[in-house]
Amino acid sequence: MSSPHVLVVDDTHVDRHVVSMALMRHNVRVTAVESVMQALMFLDSEHDVDMIVSDYCMPDMTGYNLLMEVKKSPKLAHLPVVIASSDNIPERIRKCLDGGAKDYILKPVKIVDVPRIMKYI
């Protein structure tokens, strides 16, 4: 079986790197992009993604916007999406979970969060 492939979406380089490195330590292939638009373009051309881990707060479009685009697409709706954010706002968390996110993890994402993320692959 090949390694799972996770798309990491975050506008902050450090956060993208931390999440990517944590996942790669668990033999996960990672593609990291810095915007929702880049993520959507990648998903349109790439079909072997097993999961998306996305920041919530990004310029132009949020992680919630990405979640909605994924869930309304027949070819992507099956993908698990985990939202990561430094904002512990109950209404936002509920909105993401009600919208179909598998989980909402508070940043900074830590090594101990990886098994929590991996269980959705």
UniProtKB/Swiss-Prot annotation:
UniProt cross-references to CDD domains, sorted A to Z: REC_typeA_ARR (cd17581)
Q: Which InterPro entries match?
A: ARR-like, CheY-like_superfamily, Sig_transdc_resp-reg_receiver
Q: Pfam families, per this entry?
A: Response_reg
- Superkingdom of origin organism: Eukaryota
Keywords (alphabetical) are: Cytokinin signaling pathway, Phosphoprotein, Transcription, Transcription regulation, Two-component regulatory system
Q: How is it modified after translation?
A: Two-component system major event consists of a His-to-Asp phosphorelay between a sensor histidine kinase (HK) and a response regulator (RR). In plants, the His-to-Asp phosphorelay involves an additional intermediate named Histidine-containing phosphotransfer protein (HPt). This multistep phosphorelay consists of a His-Asp-His-Asp sequential transfer of a phosphate group between first a His and an Asp of the HK protein, followed by the transfer to a conserved His of the HPt protein and finally the transfer to an Asp in the receiver domain of the RR protein.
An individual GO BP term: phosphorelay signal transduction system
> Quick check: keyword Transcription regulation in the entry?
yes
Q: What upregulates it?
A: Not induced by cytokinin.
- Ranges for domain Response regulatory come to 5-121
Q: In which tissues is it expressed?
A: Expressed in mature leaves, and at low levels in roots, shoots and flowers.
Task: List 4-aspartylphosphate occurrences by residue.
Answer: 55
Q: Which Gene3D superfamilies match?
A: 3.40.50.2300
Q: What is this protein's function per UniProt?
A: Functions as a response regulator involved in His-to-Asp phosphorelay signal transduction system. Phosphorylation of the Asp residue in the receiver domain activates the ability of the protein to promote the transcription of target genes. Type-A response regulators seem to act as negative regulators of the cytokinin signaling.
Which family is this protein grouped under? Belongs to the ARR family. Type-A subfamily.
The name under which this protein is listed is Two-component response regulator ORR8
The source organism is Oryza sativa subsp. indica
